[in-house]
Regions:
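Beta1-alpha1 glycine-rich phosphate/pyrophosphate-binding loop at the start
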Residues: 2-96, 178-179, 185-209
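FAD-binding core/adjacent interface of flavoenzyme oxidoreductases
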Residues: 2-17, 88-179, 197, 202
């Protein structure tokens, strides 16, 4: 969101640097910050600020392997600060944007609210699942975070444990049925990793074949 022609900068001090605020610490936000750093360098007339609710960068393509257990969860994320050479990082959640005042309201540690002025604002907050498109999908699992991968993995193991002692073949099959909604990159990669995961653990359950 750049300044419009004839609009003054939000900088309150004469000669203060132009501030570029980037909201979102995912691929888009981090890569853009790195790119701007390479363009701006050590110039003092430009300040780059990256804001994210997490102080780590999640490598989402590795979540599939973390869910199946072929990769340790700690390898799925890296601290954000070491990625940055000149940019400032703020761990906070953005909850409001004032376009007239050119400020972003941030909730930082312990619920403290602060206003961050900007000259240029970039939104790189990623996507959110729209559960209203498919009735009942709010009861399904999502797959976007490390926590999601852990929950899904534990749920699958719990289902295998229940199926192992279930004598009714219909109920057993239902316990072992997994439906993945979405055939894009996430859906297809997840199905592949889950298949490998099931092939690996099924040999430990004597009543499941």
């Amino acid at each position: 969101m750049p300044n419009t022609p004839g609009t003054a900068s939000t900088s309150t001090t004469l000669g203060a640097p132009t501030r570029i605020v980037i909201l979102g610490g995912g691929f888009g936000g981090v890569i853009l910050t790195r790119r701007l750093e390479s363009l701006v360098g050590a110039r003092r007339d430009v300040e780059i600020v990256l804001v994210s609710r997490d102080n780590f960068f999640l490598i989402t393509p590795l979540l599939f392997e973390a869910c199946s257990g072929t990769l340790e969860l700690r390898h799925c994320s890296q601290p954000i600060r070491p990625f940055l050479k000149h940019a400032r990082f703020i761990e906070a959640t953005a909850h409001a944007i004032d376009l007239e005042r050119r400020t972003v309201s941030l909730t930082v540690s312990e619920g403290t609210v602060q206003d961050l002025p900007y000259d240029h604002l970039v939104l790189a907050l990623g996507a959110k699942t729209n559960e209203r498109l498919i009735p009942g999908s709010s009861q399904a699992f999502t797959f976007k975070t490390v926590a999601d991968a852990i929950v899904l993995r534990n749920h699958l193991i719990e289902r295998f444990e229940r199926a192992d002692v279930e004598t009714d073949p219909v109920k057993k099959r239902r316990l072992l049925t997994v439906v993945v909604i979405g055939a894009g990159l996430v859906g297809t990669e997840l199905v592949g990793e889950l298949t490998a995961f099931v092939d690996e653990i099924v040999r430990w359950y004597r009543t499941i074949r």
